[in-house]
Structures are given as structure tokens and as C-alpha cells.
Amino acid sequence: MSNASLELGGDNWAAKDGNLLGYAVGDSSGKYVPREFTFTRGSNLAATRVAANGLIEKGRENLLLHSNSFNNWTNSNTSETSGQSGYDGSSDAWLLEKSAASGFIFKSLSGSGVQTFSAYVKANASTWGLLQCIGGSNPYAYFDLGTGVVGSIGGGTISNSIEDVGGGWYRISLIHNTTISSARIYPAEANTASGTSGSIYIQDAQLEQGLVATDYIETGATTVQAGLLEDEPRIDYTGGTGSLLLEPSRTNEFSFSEYASGNTLTGSPIITENYAISPDGGNNAFRIQDTTGGTFKRITESFSVSANSTYTQSIFVKKATSAVSIYGGVGFDYSGGTRQISYIIFDEYNGTMTAIQSQSTLTLHDAEDYGDYWRFSITATDTGSNNYLSLNIYACLSTNGTSPTAGVKDWIGYGLQLEEGSYPTSYIPNHSGGSVTRELDTINEFTLPSSIEGDCTIFIDTRELLASNKSIQFEATDGTLTYGFYSYSNHYDVYNGSAFIVDSSADANGKIVLKQSGSSVKIFVNGVDKTKAGATVNSNGIAKIIVSQSSAQSNIVALKQMQLFPTALSDAQCSALTVEGLKEEILTSYIAAVDTLEDGAEARLDTYLQNLEDLIV
């Protein structure tokens, strides 16, 4: 790699088999080849990201086996005929026909928590359908396949829906919070299944976590996942630009992050589930109301904590379309030692928060803009040696903006999250009724094909680096540190193995370039030379790159792009990199300066990048 650069990110974020894909911009043979960075996180679907469309993307899983092979289901007084015309223009639908009263088809499984059972159905001899899950109170819902409305429901269902998908087909959904052992589909009559004959068409059944039916996932003998998968790198588009998001392990302590009614309700607030479109694009935001005032109406989560602990609460609140003068809010109540109660109100029109009582140490983080929603986050640190925390989300916390007063108020919310730590991390969905943990994001070390000795240029563009130790490291062959990049005391810094070499006035975010040329080293940050006086070169060479964090570190890394050149770019190019990012003319001039590349190498880069299109995250 003596005459090549290595790039990770930029406009070419890609993944292959769960690993990040960087690419070498011309090796000594003139070829452009992928370089894989091994990525790990964990074995569940607790992580999320903001996708390129601006919506929160989750991991999804169809828990029903043989989701459209109904001959592999068990029938009770029914027959199933394949090869029928489907809702999607295929011949993948089935005719489900009953031969006795209450005939049905079912699939055995083991499921718990908030789940949505859905299927595509169409009337035939029967003009109604029935979905039922067996467990608890046996939740069920009837659906009128002629008029497209939900009929009778029962058994503790949370919500139900029927969606017209055209051609007489509907997608029907049953939403519940029950431990179940099977899922059933019935041909039915008007709010009954007692008819001794009848038939409907069925296709593409799905059982998944959450309050909405998402895009169908085909399964066979095993469950299948989609969306943001286990151990998949998270390319996060918060702010519109793709960044590699690396976060520490965090646990969401809220029992239900979207099913607000599943949490403890104090004072009887009115909760309406599936009320509005949420930041993930589904109809799974809730509405909370106080229609009477007089007493506080709130959602509560209470649990034991360590003395003098720090917790961060975050919630998405739909933006108001006009100014507000009555406020919802959040309350932290630490008890068991010297009790400390803090109240924070939020303004969903302006995207601001105000502490109207602060007995614990509070940090009100800047509201994050999620299109139609604000994400409000508050950190509270106990200083009274308390061992119990009660966290409250209020329908109305203040009618005057200065003191806690109950009143009439409603607002729309989504994504309740309470995590131990001093800052909010990305949303962790929880439908379990307990806590759920997102595991640590880690990229293992990447070894270059050959080490870089002598002159080099390192370009890094990050949205954020929060670290107590180096978050991006460049090491020699023997593993000793050559250069480590991180943020320290609100400014960028680089450690050369023996000293810090960046001036303390350097910004903590943005673009940074390290240029090593002979015995000289320079640091450019956001267009300005920020080299500390007396900075020295580390001549160990670069053989490995590590973009990682340990479970002991409270790091967030949001890496937009990283480029490694095995030559020293000019000062003007370095300055331009930290203002404009990697531009084609810089890459072109670099390639032109490398006289060992074969003719046509630049064209091969274009071809290689085109071939990456199917891998782009």
C-alpha cells in the first residue's frame, strides 16, 4: 500500500456480510480493492439509526415460521389451496376454506411482549376474517372484508387495523401485549365464526415486536430479520450526512418505550395508542391527555439505583403548530437518602426546556430536530446518596411556566427512554415489559496490506467525539501507538505517543488533518493550522487502524469519513480538506502525483465505486 490511500465513509458508506467496507484508492498494481473493517455489536435488535430518508430505522423480525407456506401450518376443520392470485400480482395466495363451525388454521410459536400479528386477506364465500392469538385472555379481532372496518375485538387487544391494499385485499392487524403459544386465522361471518362453511384468501402472515405491521418478511424453517440487523454497522444520517455511529452499551429502563399504557399510569392520564405517525414512519405515536386538571396525570417508571447516580431521560414530542402556554414535562424524584425532586417543562413549539425546580444537578441537552418531532433529553445527577428513582412523564406539569401546577393539556409522544449515563444515546426500542440493552458497538483493528513509513496525511471528519481515551488510533506493526485522535476539554487533540500536539483552541467537532512530512508534523482543524508549538513527529509508522471503544469507556463516535494518504499533501490541500472535505480534484491531484500507478487506474476507481452501489448502506 505504499502508493495508495485508504478511505472509509464519505459518499461511499458500504457494508458486506456485516462488516464495514473501506476501499484502497490505488495500490502499487493500480487496482482499487475493498478493505473490510470487522464490526460487532450484539445479538439482539435493540439498536436504531436515522436512515437516509430521515426516519428512525429499527431491526425487525418475522417470528412466524413458514409465513406463506400454509400447508406447513396446522388446520382445524379447514383446507388450504395454493396458487391463488395474490395482492401483489403473484400467484402466492392461498384459499382457506372451512368445513365446520369455527374452522381455523394456526401456527404454534412462543411469543411475548407487545406484538403485531398481521396477514393479507380477501373475501370469498366468507366476507369476514378473524385473527386470534392464544395466550392470556386470547386477544382477537374480527374484520369486515367488504366494508374495510374492524368489527368486534376482545381478549385485551391494544389496537387493531385494517388497510386497503387494492383489488379487494386488506392487510389486517391484531396488536396485543400477551405471552402467546399460537396464532390463528379464521374465515368468519359478521362478528362470529360459527358458520359451518365459508372461505377467504390469505397471504403473507407476520408476527413481530411493536405496535404496527411493517413491511412483510418472508420466512421458511427459521425466523428472518430485516431492517437494521444484529451486528450491522450503523450509518446514521442525523443532520442529513451519513456517519458511522459507535456507542457504548446502554439499557432502556422504561418497560415499554412506545406502548405508553403498558407502563405505570399515575393519576389516570388518558392514553391513546397508535394515535399519530411517529419518527419511525409508523402509526405508533401515543397521545397523553389531562382533561380535568386538579391532580397530576403522568407515566411513571420507578426502580432502585446506586447512590449518587446519573440518569438521562429522553422522549420524542410532536411539534406544536402554534405557541404553547401550558406545558408537559418530566420529573426526577430521587429518594432513600436526602430526597431530591426536579421538574423540567418542555415547549413543543419552540423546542426548548426549562427547569422549574432543580434539587438534583441537571443538564438540559439541546433539543434534537426530527422533522415533525423534537427529542427532549434531560440528565439528572443525584447528590443526596439516594437509592431509588421515580421518573415521571407529565401530561401537564405547569400552567404558568414557572411552577408545578396541574391543568388541562395534551401532547403526542414516542420513544420513552431512561438510561444510566450523562448524555442521551440513540433510541432503544423496548416492547418487553422489562428493560432492554443495546450492546457496545465495536470495530476491530484493521491491518494495512503494508505499513506506511515516513510521510503521510490523515484526514478525519466526525460529527462528535466524546471520549476519555483515544477513539481513533493509528498504530505501528508492534501495536504501539503512532497517533491517537480524540476530543479533550471541548477541543480536538492528537496524542503522538508522548505528547499532545494540538492547540487547545481547536474545535471539538468537524474536520481534522494530520500531515507528517519528514521531521515536521502539522495539524489543521476546520481550515486553520492548529499545531501546538513544539509538536514532534512519531516515526513508528502506521500499520493498523482502530476505530473502537471498550465497555469501560463512555464514548460516542460519529465518523463521517476517514482518509489515509501515504504521502504528505500540500498545506493548501490539507486546509481545503478541513473546510470542504474530500473533493475530486484533491483525489485527482494525489493520484497524478503517484507515478507508479498503471494507466487507467482512475477509471478503475469509478468502475469500482459503481460496483459498490448494491452494498451502499
Model-derived segments and spans:
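Extracellular glycan-recognition modules
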Residues: 60-67, 74-77, 102, 111-113, ...
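Short carbohydrate-recognition loop motifs
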Residues: 83-103, 244, 275-297
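Short, aromatic/His-centered strand-loop micro-motif at the edge of beta-sheets
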Residues: 103-107, 139-143, 152-165, 296-302, ...
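Localized edge beta-strand/strand-to-loop motifs within extracellular or lumenal beta-rich domains
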Residues: 123, 175-178, 319-321, 379-384, ...
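Carbohydrate-binding surfaces in secreted/extracellular proteins
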Residues: 170-174, 374-378, 387-389, 512-533
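Flexible glycan-contacting loops in extracellular carbohydrate-active proteins
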Residues: 180-192, 196-199, 388-411, 532-559
